[in-house]
């Protein structure tokens, strides 16, 4: 902080503000003329070491120009007058000799002093009153260019009101900080007087600027507010001075002791001159708290010159209500701080009152703070303490005085108690509107009405509650668009009455022990509410036309003693309540069987609802493109049918030659546009039945004449394969007769070894000696194998294959060769003759892969099957049997036809 430290020199200063214009004339001297020290009032003739008399009249100061906009001041610059400088917020001080002309060359030097913000308050009872009286010293008679804020007369000087202050109580928000030129080298008495002059006014302001002070925020100042402005919120009023200011009043002339904090208020002033310090919370200040600075020093003794708090001061504005001009932000901040008071480190107040010793001095601010806190803010409620039942698995045990709400999830069974719906309602029910008559009670699927029973309790009658619940994927809750409707009449056997629980209509019935705690629900209908009434409710997001499925929800509270009950609940199957249900669409719930042979003729029983005497059952099949390919109506047995069951005969499928199951569909029709949803059904291929062979492990084709095997047939496991085994020849890949027969070819090698061994499970025929033939036949493979001796296949003997037709002309059964039929279910199975020793030549009739082993052939994908017609991967035993039986029964003989290559 700049200072002028010159002995026996007289200090004179001039304040120059923003605009570069000459100040108005001060007197006869004209502009720029300096006053002699003799004519200068004592308050402006500040000789170092000489105290300033309090009663002196101040010198007239030129009226300042309008304030410059902006948050920061420009740097110092030379002023038109010689020896002066212009600066904001700095002040230029011209030092000259005693009585010398300030304008003389070399008469003094210019020191630039920055703006000093005074933090002390004067104890003088009244400031100088001659300032406002000498209005001619201001040039135009107006005290300031800055009018005080509306509704607050004490924030700025009010001319004409005695007791107006010469000093602005907010140095940071006023551009005329008159006493800001003091330096550390100034006279202690002068500093004492000046500081106490300001302190008296600041204390008066602080006494009313508490937590909920009615004074406006410093942000309402004409000058733009900056974070450095010291007028932040103060603490509650108290009688002592701030500890950082007390040294100004107690120190003697000499070195000034250091302050524990900066001299600028910076929002840390919390006390006024009206009582003892109060217990302030650390949260009351934005920049610090008393708790951060250690113990508070004892308050100083009272000074002789203290303003009476009851006397009007410059900050007292009689005509303004206390809270008219308080900005909302000020009150909101005060409310926040007031709410935080109980968390203070110091003893909290009791019942909203401050500690003893402060009630008299701050009763009004305290009451105002309490009122504002109640108006602006609501106390945050404590967290809800959920019961253990809601936290841990929805326990169904409740108090009788606190039954669960209707949307509370409840189990249907708890320990030995169980609420069960013995008879479910139908899947459709036409709900009625409020403007139309009743549609009757909800009916059950097999006829009658739903039945509900409580198991595990039969001590005394209980009340059964029923309401309409939702049927969507969300949790079960009361339906917004449907409510239960009480049905009465001579045909209704169950007594009931309606009740309303949380806005939901509930139907209550009685479960009697003499009825085994069961109730026939013949008194409950469904009422449809108007969509617009529900959709316009606050917070309702569901749409009525998309929520037409409901459930019947039943609930019972079983007493357990000790004021406890166990609540169990059961919900029915979904019920469609849309108007389409008025068409009584048929519904299929179960049916048996689900598959049948393509020949049909079996009996099919359907179970469902809404079946009529003239209901039809139609089977259909659609192609991959969705087009209808087959449609057939089944014959319904009317004598064995009812409203809930239909008995019919499955029709015959259109294609009986299918080799794999066929998926079709059927539906029940009660007339035009009254069809049930389609149900799937499967037609299976015809199964060719085979007679068992003498050996239970062998099954083959029956023959019409002669025993099928000779005595020399060996059924031992097959020998290891030999290189010339023919596996890829198409003759081995055709398991059934389809096109024709092949012809014999010359033998590859003679039979010299023992009889061939047969693999178990093969369809085998005996062979006789002769030549070996190999031809590509689509249906059957004639592989003559020589036998050393065969009672059926010897020379001139003939073995009948059991075929329903004669072989072609080139085929001669008496030849010493008879064809074996390869097993279609064992791809690598065949009748293996033993090749001659050392024979390794591959015959011309075999393909290149014939010499591979069985394991290699299996890995390579070689297999017998229907490679020309049906893939082998999806073939089944039933399909193969059906195909073989079909071809054997209807295959025409084609003599002389050459098999395909």
UniProtKB/Swiss-Prot annotation:
UniProt feature, compositional bias: Gly residues: 96-109, 151-165
A Pfam entry, by short name: RHD_DNA_bind
Cross-linked residues, Glycyl lysine isopeptide (Lys-Gly) (interchain with G-Cter in SUMO2): 689
Compartment(s) of residence: Cytoplasm; Nucleus
Xref: InterPro entries: Ig-like_fold, Ig_E-set, IPT_dom, NFAT, p53-like_TF_DNA-bd_sf, RHD_dimer, RHD_DNA_bind_dom, RHD_DNA_bind_dom_sf
PTM statement from Swiss-Prot or TrEMBL: Phosphorylated by NFATC-kinases; dephosphorylated by calcineurin/PPP3CA. Phosphorylated on Ser-168 and Ser-170 by MTOR, IRAK1, MAPK7/ERK5 and MAPK14/p38, on Ser-213 and Ser-217 by MAPK8 and MAPK9, and on Ser-289 and Ser-344 by RPS6KA3. Phosphorylated by GSK3B. Phosphorylation by GSK3B markedly increases NFATC4 ubiquitination. Phosphorylation by MAPK8/JNK1, MAPK9/JNK2 and RPS6KA3 may stimulate NFATC4 transcriptional activity. Phosphorylation at Ser-168 and Ser-170 is stimulated by UV irradiation.
Protein name: Nuclear factor of activated T-cells, cytoplasmic 4
Gene: Nfatc4
